[in-house]
Amino acid sequence: MIRPSLTVLAFLSAAGACGAAQARSDENLTDQAQVAAAHSVADVVVTGSNIRRANTEGFNPVQVIGREELESSGKSTTADLLRSISANTGNGSNETQNSGWSSGAAGIGLRGLSQKNTLVLLNGRRVANYGFPGGGLSDTFVNLNALPMVATQRLEVLKDGASAVYGSDAVAGVTNIITRQNFQGLEFGASYGLADQGGLETSTAKLVAGHGDLETDGYNILLSLEAYTRNRLDQDQRDLTRSGIYTDLPGGRWNGWSAKGARFLVDGKSVPLLNAQGQCPEGMVLTASAPIDGLSGDTCAINLAPHTTLIPSTDRYQAYLFGTKRLTPQIEAFGEVLYSYVEGASLFGSSPFFTLEGGRFALNAETGLAEPVSNLLPANNPYNPYGVATPIEYTFFDLGRTLKTNESKSYRALAGVRGRHDRFDWEAAVFASGSDERETVSGGFAHRWNLADALADGTLNLHDPAATPQAVLDGIRLSTLRPAESRLYGADFKISGELFNLPAGQVGYAAGVEFRHESLVSSNPWQIDAGLQIRPAIAAVDGERDVWAAYAEFNIPVLSNLDIQVAARADEYSDFGSAFSPKAGVRWKPLEWLALRASASRGFRAPSLSENSASTMISYGSVIDPYDPDLPNSRQSPTFFTVGNTDLEPEKTRSYNLGVVFTPTRDTALSIDWYQIKLDNLIGTGNTTAIVQSNDPADVVRDERGKLQAVYNRYRNLTALETSGFDVDFSQRWRTEGWGTFTVSSAYTHLLEYKRPNAAGGPLLDYAGSNRGATLPAHKATTRLAWNRDVFDANLTWYYTSGYDQVPEVGGQSRVDAYHQFDLYAAWSGLERVTLYAKIENLLDEAPPHDASFPGVRAPYDFGQYDLRGRYFRVGFDVRF
């Protein structure tokens, strides 16, 4: 039931509508420099507020990327463009991180906070989250690759907390994708790109058509179609990663597998792990850098580069339809439909199915617990010369490379009406949004029982894998399908206008109510639940909830140059309860060219459905058990469960912002903003060692003898986090006689602090400028020099990411180097209605800086920050009618 606070908020402003005045409407918005240069500015709604205004400087710092910049950036996806902005400082995910969650999906996380703390909107309204959470279970996000690019008019990135306006998730900021409105004409184009070092061939095609003028014809309809395909980039396609050997780099080793015990079964014979010259199946022999089990010499190794993907392949197809119809002079209907199909595919290197130490598990279908899978080669196997069951180490490359394919089908359908009364504007809408995922994994995985049979009767030829009958391999090979679906249904009503006059001007207001239903269901492949897959990856979610909300916002002119903003929102969740989010801001313009702004707010992030529902993830490892009945304080290998917790409370935030905006001329703009975010009740999981030591029966499961069987690690409200920094945005335009127009713009973010404890109850440690737990560079900037003259346009963009401290020091490396990337873009529109363009990304072919904390995980650099595409060429054309 909705609590009184929602009702009060809903009617507080609506009751004042009788004194409101008509608000003007204009859907065009450019960045700060362009707005300052304009001779007149119509009322607009800017992300972070629901009140229309004509001020060029708002209460909140908003970075606006207009259509012109979208095109001249040369970026072919929204995710690539947003990844490059300075406020996206790190600790986020992108589609190159495909091994742990999903090929082809990408999100955005502002301020170094995870992507679940950044709200993504399409035309000011929410869209459904991606079906597979990142970060294990907790990191829910909107897949940017499922949202339209060619239909976008502008991107607005609010770099301040906005729970008082939008509710949950708007902790670090808001990204609002705004599509073209009242567009007439026809545009189509295509592009082709490829990497200088080979691979990653990319093709795009697009079409945008608009018909009808809303003012003269009473209607407008917009249709956009786009297609994007990109080939996969594997490790063996780059010199840095081709061999998988990084021993010449600080802290480096080979990225592969070798036998880890004292003996290794090769060609049916047990041979020494070391001094294995001539006896390695792939012919790859490395010299051990240190004695192993007291021995020294050479060791067999497997190069995983041909079996591991750096950047997944992607096929993406999208259709977007938006229509507006004027019903009366004061009322119009509008609606939109978005459909997106995205498929991504990647290889991930197989690990040995059998190791000499054991450590492989499968799920017991009856108990739901993981149980060990024997690594013993049966005594009667013809390739076992010992006559007794013997441990082996074996990797099933004869089953084919392990290929993971993700299919995602996303949609949003919306219908609404809006109107103007002589005293206020109003709008109402209903919408449905969803995302359906299918993850297929084939090759490299073995059917537990069919494999056991093949080892028992010797039909799996360990001496010559190529001689194994195809029918035997087909019976062993296991392919799995993991489905997921995310749903979002909602309805809203909002009103805005002007309440009454004060000596300094009109008091503006906005108010509204919202309802939405959210659900997330992710299931295990049936083969896992049946106990057929060895070493299964389990991440299942089943949750849903209803959310009711009401909000109000006021813009109060105190003086002719001093305004105050007051906003509040109340949310009622069916699962955890209620949340109240207030915000206050002030804007003072002492001079025509100078504006000061400040804001303070409280916000929240609701526990994600994967955190507070019936969710389960299984992981593997070991832990010291002080209570083991046979050998206390010995290392044991139970089943580790990460599970949801229905008793979670929301994370609570306090956000502060101070800023100054200079616009001394119509061609000059400079803004400096300081921010601070404090989070309490941060949701996370506990330390497994501490859980076992506590021996709480609710979390630690033992058999009748007291042997450790399972450890349950539940999401809890554990810690706090504090982060602060400042942004600098600058733009300067020079108009010349005969030489065209030059523009320099720069967006810079400095991360001052990012403090959180390593464990609950521990002291706050500063992560800023280091990779302690997550890579958080202290400085990030994007600087562009643009030139246009008649039919020529060109720009040079410099992307800078500072180096960071290696914490703790690894392999003698105490600091990771900075990274510089230069992109060059040029366009020519000398043909009537036709524009030809070319782009070179990473002009100097700069390689990612080596990070010794990534010694053998696909590549020796932080692939959350960088990728190995290298210098990249793209050419294309656009035609406009």
Predicted features, each with a name:
Residues 742-829, 844:
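C-terminal beta-barrel architecture of Gram-negative outer-membrane proteins
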Residues 192-196, 203, 211, 227-231, ...:
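Transmembrane beta-strands of outer-membrane beta-barrel pores
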Residues 137-138, 149-153, 164-175, 181-241, ...:
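Outer-membrane beta-barrel translocator/receptor signature
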Residues 446, 752, 800-806, 827-881:
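C-terminal beta-signal and adjacent terminal beta-strands/loops
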Residues 135, 231, 237-248, 276-314, ...:
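Surface-exposed, low-complexity loop segments enriched in small/polar and acidic residues
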Residues 1-84, 111, 206-211, 329, ...:
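N-terminal Sec signal peptide and the immediately downstream disordered periplasmic leader
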Residues 147, 182-185, 198, 214-219, ...:
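Short loop/turn motifs that connect adjacent beta-strands in outer-membrane beta-barrel proteins
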Residues 35-36, 45-101, 109, 122, ...:
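N-terminal plug
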